[in-house]
């Protein structure tokens, strides 16, 4: 159990993290929530604390993921135009962003492996942290290449499958954490493993199972659950359309501005 002094410091860090969130200073929000995680002394984080940690990291990583996608798109355009000098500059800049992405992912994955996953006691917290572990390995797989990409993909699959096993046995099909896991797991199949059939099957099964039990959904999680269900359906529509286009014309490539599958919402 945490000592009274540690508990007081913990409350202070949580308050500072909320202040940082309001000020949109997400790097500092991460620092405060890391201090909270290290102050709990084998206790679980509260639901509020784990959500703050998730939001902090999601914003910090999200900004870099967006930057990386923009720079990669520009790199492709400059390559197609034969602007080798520009391509060289862009690659150096992309490498800088990739270093930041790696550092952020390594930070949260270390926290998950050493503190958060081992301390998780309830079914929903186990799924929450294992899903988070899968997410950050997936973010690494988005930009790594060769063996590093393969390793990141394998770590993602292992974490998501472990989370899925617990979710299927301990969480209702309408539980927002279970739905969020299905959403992100299906995006992994589609984007990283290039398996649209498995992505669609997973998303459709999660959606159908949730629809069947929609009348049992409590008011407190109705908004979160139905929002993720909508994202699952949006992805299914997008992926089904893409698969039909591929059948019609296998050689046709996606336009640079093609719609991206929806990842989980920031909450």
Swiss-Prot record:
Keyword vocabulary terms for this entry: Acetylation, Cytoplasm, Nucleus, Phosphoprotein
- Protein function: Is associated with a DNA binding complex that binds to the G box, a well-characterized cis-acting DNA regulatory element found in plant genes. Involved in the regulation of nutrient metabolism.
Q: Which InterPro entries match?
A: 14-3-3, 14-3-3_CS, 14-3-3_dom_sf, 14-3-3_domain
Record protein name field: 14-3-3-like protein GF14 chi
One of its GO biological process terms is:
regulation of metabolic process
Q: Does the keyword Phosphoprotein apply?
A: yes
List-wise, which residues carry Phosphoserine? 72, 195, 267
Please report a single Pfam family linked to this protein. 14-3-3
Q: Which organism is it from?
A: Arabidopsis thaliana
Q: Output the PANTHER family linked to this UniProt entry.
A: 14-3-3 PROTEIN
């Amino acid at each position: 159990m945490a000592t009274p002094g540690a508990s007081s410091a913990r409350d202070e860090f949580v308050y500072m993290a909320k202040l940082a969130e309001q000020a949109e200073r997400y790097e500092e929000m991460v620092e405060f929530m890391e201090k909270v995680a290290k102050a709990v002394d084998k206790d679980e984080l509260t639901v509020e604390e784990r959500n703050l940690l998730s939001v902090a990291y999601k914003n910090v990583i999200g900004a870099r993921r967006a930057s990386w996608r923009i720079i990669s798109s520009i790199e492709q355009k400059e390559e197609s135009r034969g602007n080798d000098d520009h391509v060289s500059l862009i690659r150096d800049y992309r490498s800088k962003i990739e270093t930041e992405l790696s550092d952020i992912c390594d930070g949260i994955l270390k926290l998950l492996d050493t503190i958060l996953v081992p301390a998780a006691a309830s079914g929903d917290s186990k799924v929450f942290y294992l899903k988070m572990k899968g997410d950050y390995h997936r973010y690494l797989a988005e930009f790594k290449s060769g063996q590093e990409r393969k390793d990141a993909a394998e770590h993602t699959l292992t974490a998501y499958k472990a989370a899925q096993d617990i979710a299927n046995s301990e969480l209702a099909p309408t539980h927002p954490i279970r739905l969020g896991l299905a959403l992100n797991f299906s995006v992994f199949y589609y984007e990283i493993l290039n398996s649209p059939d498995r992505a669609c099957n997973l998303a459709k099964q999660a959606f159908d199972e949730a629809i069947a039990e929609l009348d049992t959904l409590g008011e407190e999680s109705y908004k979160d659950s139905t929002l993720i269900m909508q994202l699952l359906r949006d992805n299914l529509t997008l992926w089904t359309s893409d698969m039909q286009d591929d059948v019609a014309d296998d050689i046709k490539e996606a336009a640079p501005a093609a719609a991206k599958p929806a990842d989980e919402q920031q909450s």
